[in-house]
Structures are given as structure tokens and as C-alpha cells.
């Protein structure tokens, strides 16, 4: 048997599969326990396979933890070392990829030319002297050199010096990507360094849970492009798990609806909602690399658009902006009070009909984990006092302000939340679903009390308030889906993010237009994945003319997709030269051989592509490869491009081959 697990920001889902019969035996779902992932994984394994030991041969995992860490910027402090770059470069181009000039960046002397030759030798003793002090302010490091994909000498030498100075994670750009754009490689290395401890904690939790149950299966992880990799490979390159969860959800949608050929897939999670396109039964891939929030990576992933909207998104009401969505995930009030009876009693006694309570009385903060001695000493007096106060019981924002005498200034709660010390709890769509009876997992009475409070402040009744929130969700998902289809149209791609398109979408979603009605239609079906899909996807479909599908077991679609992937590796080798000699090289520019005849060059290129793809395939944990090598002829352009042809090698195997 095999198990597929998806650990999301809010829920952890699982499926138990009979490998021989290719049959789903059982599904399970449990809240993700961020303070200790072993708890939710243990619960899930107990639900799926109550007996210890057993014949679990394979465990495949997908997770949104890396993606959510990027979206919510819950990182450790990473020092970025750049060779061949300047502060002006970062000011001019860094923002476009998510890197801004900051004290966290060190511009090292030394550099390479575009052929990979050393054009400026660094003063390594001086570099080491700088690093002795500079490295003390960081938890991890990323090292990237311009043209470093052609020559790794600068990155690897710097890594060795840092390694001798400190025992902290160090990642080089050359270890992750051969992308020409060094800033995109810098983003990859920067994120990989920060995600390493997050992913290591996740994997350790999984293996400990399995070991306690006497289970020792083969483990693999879903990559952002929908293929899978071994546990060892994933630990080295956790950045490749970015969009792992969304990729698995699309694979799950395809598996649950085998007849589906063309679709817009919306995965509604707890933290984000993701939209992707399935065309001719295959998932569209973004070859330029995954973009997560402001970060443009060079990691290939599914072509996806993400909105910070999920079941655990905060609903904010204020006089300036009215009802709108908060930033990041919060703990639904209906779920939080289940753990804290005192807060449940507080809501039960709250008189929302006659009391003049500020909105801050319904926003709570709970202690998530205590800071260590070093981190605790770095907190200011108010932050330390907040930690001490929350040890006893969660406190409302209003109570904290009264306690510390800060009527309007920041209490440092944002810092405490970002670093995982406290957890915010507020009204969310999950609470609204409790009130309407569409989803019951927590305390409905608390959700109802909170809704009455918010509705009163908005000048409406509770039922109208809930209906308004549902429409806000449906409209945002509708706009996300239509924009995804617009970006897929080559003639419209350039204007997809324009203000005019936004106004057009706002107009089409309007239900009180007097003179004109606009309704988009498409041959692509609308498919929903995720626990709330059955609630919201039909509402989204009402806004435009498409068929709507929510497959059975949509609530565990990610876990289904996790167990159905394949290991896939690719390698491309180029031949350059419109006449002899012919140069054979990797796409990154690394030279392989110079040949006097085109026939010899093609033989060398084919062999090199096969060798390269198998090397990467086995690194990812593949077995029994099926290898294909394809030649693509290109017409060389004199004086502009000497590219003659490209040999593309592919090696693949099914995930189930790993246990055969």
C-alpha cells in the first residue's frame, strides 16, 4: 500500500492507496499543528492506518509550507553574498525579482567574464576578515556570482571560508540552477537557505511519526512542476518544493476527473487560493520559473496564479476601508476557543447588542512558542511583557493595549507573529462557514457572536453580512480565474495586469449594471479542489458562462495528486557554429567539446545529453529510467546567433517504480 500526504498551512490531508488495484481505500483530514508537526502527522497516520507496522511501501508528500513561508515572509535572517554585482545593480534590477538593496547583502570583490574566466581575483584573506564579523548577524547564507553557472570557483571558495567560520546553512547559486539571470539564481539560493530548516523540521517530523509506528517506507516529495524527487534530494533543494501543494492539487484534479481535458483549476486552501490551467490533459508549466509573491525564482513550476485568500484569511472592518481582507493567515475564532475555554466563556458573556466594544476586542493573540534565551533577550520590554501575559491565556488586542498603555502605537505584535512566537486569531471565512452551517469543526456559537458584532458595525444583520463575505470570496476567485485565462491568450498577455482589465472585471462582476451586462465564456471547465470548493466554485461559475465541476474527494485532492506523480529529469546540450569548428556545450554555457565535423558534434551532443539527464535522474531518486533523446534543428542567424541545434534528453519513471 501507499500513502499520499499534503501538509498545508491549515490542514493536513491524506489518502491510503492500494497499489496493485490502484484503488483509494481511505481519506483523512486534520488541522496542521505548526507548533509540532508530528502531532498532525500522527493523527493522520492513525486515521489512515490504525495498525502499527504494516505494508506501507511508499509515502509521497506535497506541502504548501515553503510557499506559505514566502508569502507570509516567515524567514530566518539570511546573508546574501554577491560577486560581480554592485549596490546600483540591485537598486536598478533587484526589486523586479524580490531582492532589494539592504544591509543583508554583501558585495564581494572579484568577478568572472561572460565566458566564465576569472577577470578579477578576490582578496580572499580580506574577504575572510570581513566575514568573521559580518556572518555573526545571520542564521544562514546564500552565495551567488554573476556568470557563476559557467565557473563555480568564486562561490565554492567563499562557501569554504564561511564554512570554516561558522556552523550555519550555506547555499551556492551554482548548486541549484544554471539560469543565466544571476539575480534569479540569487533568489533561488536566498530562499533555499531560509527554507532548509523549515523543510528539515517537516521531514524529521514525518520520519519520527513513521518510526514510532514501525513504518519505514520509501519517501518522495512533489516538486513545484508536479514531478517528484527523493527525500535526500529534497532536503538539499527545498526551494523546489515551492508550489508543491498547488502542483499536487492539479494532479489530483486530473486524476479525479480522468475525462477532463481542458480546465481552469481553483484550489481553495486555508492560506491561499491558487488557479492553474490544464490543457489537453496536461498541466501548463511556467518555464521562466515560479513567482511567489515578490520573489521571481528560476525553479520551473506549474503556471499558477495565487491570491492571499483562504479559509483562514482575516476579515477586517474599519471606517476607512470598509470590509476587506487582512494579510496572512490567522486562527479562526471558532477554532481557537476550542483550545482555550476561558476565551470561549469571554465570547459567551460578550453583549454585542448593547455593549460599546471596539473591534480590537474581537482580535486575539495566543502564545505559539516561547523564544529561546538569546532571542528572548533581544525583545524589548513590551514584547517580553506580552509573552509573559500570553502564557496564562490569549488576550484581545484591546486588552493588550490597555495593559501596556499604548492606545495607538505598535506593540511589537507583528514582529512576534512573524517570528512564530504568537499567533493571531480573528474572524475568517471559516467562521462564516460555521455560521451558515456549511462547515462545522469548531464552536459555532462563538462564530455567530463575532458575526453579529461585525454586522452591527457594518450596519446590517448577520445573515446579510455572511452573504456579503461569500460574494466577496466568489468575486475574488472569479477575477483570479478570468485573469488566468487572459494571461494564457498571447494577444492579451501584455494587458492582463492593466487597470483597464481590472475595471472590466469589476464591471462584469457587478449585479446592478443598468445599461450593459458583460459575461465571459470559455471552453475550459471550472474545476474546484479543496474543502470549501463545493461551497464557492458554483458561485464563481455564476459570474461567467462555463461548466462547473467539483470532483468526489475534492477535499483531499492534493494528497491524491501527491501519490500519482513521476520522476522526470531533462538535459539540453547545444551545438554552435554555422560552419566548422562546432562547439558542443550545456545550455548554461559550460563547454563540453569542440568538433571538426557536424556529424561528430551531433554524436557528442547526443551522448552528453543522455549522460547528463541520467545523472540528474538518479540524483532525484529515479529507478528504471525510460530515456528519450530528441534533436531540435535551428536555423542559425549569421552575425547574431550561431546556434545550430539542441539535443534534448528526458528520463522518467513512475513513482510506483520506486518500490517495484
Predicted segment positions?
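N-terminally biased helix-coil "hinge/interface" segments that flank
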Residues: 1-660
Amino acid at each position: 500500500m501507499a500513502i499520499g500526504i499534503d501538509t498545508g498551512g491549515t490542514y493536513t490531508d491524506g489518502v491510503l492507496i492500494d497499489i496493485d488495484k490502484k484503488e483509494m481505500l481511505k481519506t483523512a483530514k486534520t488541522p496542521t499543528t505548526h507548533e509540532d508537526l508530528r502531532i498532525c502527522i500522527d493523527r493522520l497516520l492513525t486515521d489512515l492506518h490504525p495498525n502499527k507496522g504494516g505494508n506501507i511501501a511508499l509515502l509521497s508528500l506535497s506541502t504548501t509550507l515553503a510557499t506559505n513561508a514566502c508569502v507570509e515572509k516567515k524567514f530566518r535572517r539570511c546573508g546574501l553574498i554577491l560577486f560581480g554585482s554592485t549596490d546600483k545593480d540591485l537598486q536598478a534590477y533587484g526589486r523586479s525579482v524580490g531582492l532589494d538593496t539592504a544591509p543583508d547583502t554583501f558585495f564581494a570583490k572579484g568577478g568572472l567574464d561572460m565566458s566564465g574566466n576569472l577577470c578579477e581575483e578576490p582578496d580572499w584573506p580580506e574577504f575572510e576578515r570581513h566575514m568573521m564579523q559580518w556572518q555573526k548577524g545571520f542564521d544562514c547564507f546564500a552565495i551567488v556570482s554573476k556568470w557563476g553557472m559557467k565557473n563555480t570557483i568564486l562561490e565554492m571558495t567563499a562557501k569554504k571560508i564561511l564554512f570554516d567560520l561558522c556552523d550555519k546553512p550555506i547555499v551556492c547559486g551554482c548548486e541549484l540552477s544554471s539560469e543565466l539571470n544571476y539575480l534569479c539564481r540569487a533568489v533561488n539560493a536566498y530562499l533555499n537557505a531560509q527554507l532548509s530548516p523549515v523543510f528539515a523540521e517537516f521531514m524529521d517530523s514525518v520520519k519520527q511519526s513513521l518510526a514510532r509506528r514501525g513504518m519505514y517506507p520509501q519517501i518522495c516529495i512533489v516538486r513545484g512542476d508536479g514531478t517528484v524527487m527523493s527525500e535526500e534530494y529534497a532536503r538539499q533543494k527545498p526551494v523546489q518544493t515551492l508550489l508543491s501543494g498547488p502542483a499536487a492539487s492539479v494532479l489530483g484534479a486530473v486524476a479525479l476527473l480522468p475525462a477532463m481535458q481542458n480546465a481552469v483549476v481553483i484550489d481553495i486552501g486555508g492560506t491561499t487560493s491558487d488557479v492553474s490551467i490544464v490543457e489537453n490533459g496536461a498541466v501548463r508549466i511556467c518555464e521562466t520559473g515560479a513567482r511567489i509573491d515578490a520573489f521571481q525564482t528560476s525553479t520551473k513550476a506549474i503556471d499558477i496564479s495565487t491570491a492571499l485568500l483562504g479559509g483562514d484569511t482575516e476579515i477586517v472592518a474599519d471606517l476607512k476601508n470598509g470590509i476587506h481582507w487582512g494579510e496572512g493567515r490567522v486562527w479562526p475564532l471558532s477554532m481557537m476557543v476550542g483550545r482555550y475555554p476561558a476565551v470561549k466563556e469571554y465570547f459567551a458573556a460578550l453583549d454585542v447588542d448593547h455593549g460599546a466594544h471596539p473591534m480590537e476586542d474581537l482580535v486575539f493573540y495566543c502564545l505559539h512558542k516561547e523564544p529561546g534565551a538569546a532571542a528572548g533577550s533581544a525583545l524589548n520590554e513590551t514584547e517580553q511583557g506580552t509573552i509573559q501575559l500570553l502564557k496564562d491565556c490569549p488576550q484581545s488586542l484591546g486588552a493588550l493595549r490597555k495593559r501596556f498603555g499604548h492606545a495607538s502605537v505598535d506593540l511589537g505584535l507583528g514582529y512576534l507573529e512573524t517570528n512564530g512566537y504568537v499567533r493571531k486569531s480573528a474572524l475568517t471565512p471559516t467562521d462564516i462557514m460555521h455560521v451558515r452551517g456549511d462547515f462545522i469543526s469548531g464552536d459555532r456559537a462563538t462564530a455567530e457572536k463575532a458575526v453579529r458584532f461585525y454586522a452591527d458595525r457594518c450596519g446590517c444583520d448577520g445573515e446579510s453580512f455572511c452573504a456579503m463575505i461569500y460574494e466577496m470570496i466568489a468575486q475574488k476567485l472569479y477575477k483570479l480565474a478570468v485573469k488566468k485565462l487572459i494571461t494564457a491568450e498571447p494577444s492579451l498577455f501584455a494587458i492582463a495586469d492593466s487597470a483597464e482589465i481590472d475595471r472590466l472585471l469589476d464591471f462584469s462582476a457587478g449585479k446592478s449594471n443598468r445599461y450593459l451586462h458583460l459575461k465571459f465564456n470559455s471552453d475550459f471547465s471550472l474545476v474546484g479542489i479543496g474543502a470549501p470548493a463545493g461551497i464557492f466554485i458554483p458561485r464563481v461559475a455564476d459570474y461567467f458562462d462555463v461548466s462547473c465541476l467539483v470532483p468526489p474527494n475534492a477535499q483531499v485532492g492534493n494528497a491524491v495528486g501527491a501519490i500519482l506523480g513521476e520522476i522526470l529529469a531533462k538535459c539540453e546540450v547545444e551545438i554552435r557554429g554555422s560552419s566548422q569548428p562546432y562547439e558542443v556545450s550545456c545550455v548554461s554555457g559550460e563547454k563540453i567539446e569542440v568538433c571538426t565535423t557536424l556529424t561528430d558534434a551531433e554524436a557528442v551532443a547526443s551522448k552528453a545529453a543522455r549522460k547528463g539527464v541520467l545523472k540528474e535522474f538518479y540524483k532525484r531518486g529515479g529507478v528504471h529510467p525510460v530515456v528519450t533523446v530528441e534533436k531540435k534543428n535551428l536555423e542559425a542567424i549569421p552575425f547574431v546567433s550561431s546556434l545550430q541545434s539542441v539535443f534534448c534528453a528526458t528520463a522518467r519513471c513512475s513513482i510506483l517504480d520506486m518500490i517495484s
